Amino acid sequence: MNPNIETAYALAKQQYAAQGVDVDAAIAALDNIPVSMHCWQGDDVTGFEASAGALTGGIQATGNYPGKARNAQELRQDLELAMTLIPGAKRLNLHAIYLESEQPVARDQIQPEHFANWVKWAKKMNIGLDFNPSCFSHPLSADGLTLSHPDAKIRQFWIDHCKASRRISAYFGKELGTASVMNIWIPDGMKDLPADRLAPRQRLLAALDEVISEKFDEAHHIDAVESKLFGIGAESYTVGSNEFYMGYAASRNVALCLDAGHFHPTEVISDKISAASLYVKHLLLHVSRPVRWDSDHVVLLDDETQAIATEIIRNDLLDRVHIGLDFFDASINRIAAWVIGTRNMKKALLRALLEPTQALRDAEAKWDFSSRLALMEETKSMPWQAVWDYVCARNGVAVGADWLATVKNYETEVLATRK
């Protein structure tokens, strides 16, 4: 290790110790907090279905940066490089459209065998897998309704797809020894004002109950449901609203997914974590960066990312909150996007772990809000960067922006050959 990194770390450790912060404990904790990286950044949410069509569901990947993965082998190769540039525990989040099969497979017929290569790869990488049914970009989602569709046959197709997805998720958990969190997000909604807001929600409620009727060991599989405010083409009404899924998660004992881009522009999910934790056992987070809408920009080390991490750590929720990322930017190098976003999430977690939380709470308990604010602000200028550099170095990961050269070299030698 570079002696300058060790020296800076030793000095930082002394400063944190003076505030009552155990840096070694913080690093040990960080090493074991997995962040679930999303596979769909690597190919702009295209997937590997034989009949893959245009991206639908009110979501968009904008840009045309060269070198996107064209098959599972290339996607895994790209992910491997990205993961070597990120310290600590990681997971991979897969969508159903990332199956591998020599023959076309209907979505309601997908099987664990179609994801066997992903499991084999995950074992090699020593990571867990998470999963999602893909209720978009399909002829039977063209009406903008899936699990809430008034046509019973179409609705049943999507119910069966979600059921099949749960079996795959449970297979992941059993094979890898770590529970797969399977998140159900549907694009169901309407462009203009509906005459009946209740009936689609009644259908969705019944459909979800059928989806989760088969029981699995929570050690292998955890169900999650995700709300959204609106999507393109569903501006006026979303069937799976925040209130719908909050009630569903609490009443059915499933996890609630909070996506940073799925609320009003001035709402933040960091404020929702503590409230939701009182009513649901598990929370799934989709950390993203909405720019004026659910644009899924690459995650920054900004105030909200930091606030999300801080809420998890302050409230001791690591065993109940599952951290996932959800962004897809096709205008920049896709591997760089993964690395930037995931490292930023890790940095936010480290900063939260290095916070003198007890001192803040003591000041608050005494109604000493001046000290509370002063300590919060002084914490921002503590030498957490020296600790981060040390974390990267001890994990054999590039320090600072040194990783960028590796990505640029890979772009020249590998990505540029993909036409």
Curated annotation (Swiss-Prot):
Root EC class: isomerase
Gene label: rhaA
Compartment list: Cytoplasm
Gene Ontology MF: a single term: manganese ion binding
Recorded GO CC terms: cytoplasm
Cofactor(s) listed: Mn(2+)
The organism of origin for this protein: Tolumonas auensis (strain DSM 9187 / NBRC 110442 / TA 4)
Function field: Catalyzes the interconversion of L-rhamnose and L-rhamnulose.
Official protein name in the record: L-rhamnose isomerase
Record pathway: Carbohydrate degradation; L-rhamnose degradation; glycerone phosphate from L-rhamnose: step 1/3
Free-text remark on how the cofactor is bound: Binds 1 Mn(2+) ion per subunit.
Annotated binding of Mn(2+), by residue: 262, 294, 296
